[in-house]
């Protein structure tokens, strides 16, 4: 995997999906023609699928396009200009914002935090992922607003879990 792009073997695993849909009726889900714009929070069928996989409610899922980095950027941008649901003010009005960056990590994640001027706090990565003892200590700082996290599990290539302080 380079720069978040799946390798040939990963792409080959889903090649058969390109020929599954053979009739326009196959493109309708819950009355929505999926060849066109769907619901803002994502297709209901996709939300049900991922809710089952993630063990949550469909209404707790947001299904976006295939570029998760865009969703990440949009979320950070909104927090920067407007704050989050429990924020007292937009992050741009705070004295400082810190973001936990497991290293090695994904350069495009780092570019987002860098472009907003966040202090990037390096978190070492063990064979099991970020050193969670370090993360648990660092999130005690109220200036820490998030952590980049790259997961590799079935159906989820990239996911940024944002830890809101």
Tell me what each language-model feature is.
Residues 26-27, 31-165:
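Conserved core of the PLP fold type I
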């Amino acid at each position: 995997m380079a720069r978040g792009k799946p390798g040939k073997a990963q792409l080959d695993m889903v090649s058969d999906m390109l020929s599954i849909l053979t009739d326009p009726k196959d493109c309708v889900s819950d009355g929505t023609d999926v060849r066109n714009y769907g619901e803002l929070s994502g297709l209901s069928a996709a939300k049900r699928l991922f809710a089952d996989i993630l063990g949550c409610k469909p209404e707790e899922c947001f299904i976006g396009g295939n570029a998760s980095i865009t969703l990440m950027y949009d979320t950070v941008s909104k927090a920067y200009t407007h704050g989050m649901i429990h924020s007292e003010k937009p992050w741009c009005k705070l004295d400082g914002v810190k973001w936990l960056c497991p290293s090695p990590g994904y350069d495009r994640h780092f570019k987002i935090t860098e472009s907003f001027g966040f202090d990037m706090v390096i978190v070492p990565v063990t064979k099991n992922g970020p050193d969670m003892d370090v993360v648990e200590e660092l999130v005690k700082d109220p200036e820490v607003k998030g952590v980049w996290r790259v997961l590799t599990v079935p159906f989820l290539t990239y996911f940024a879990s944002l830890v809101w302080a």
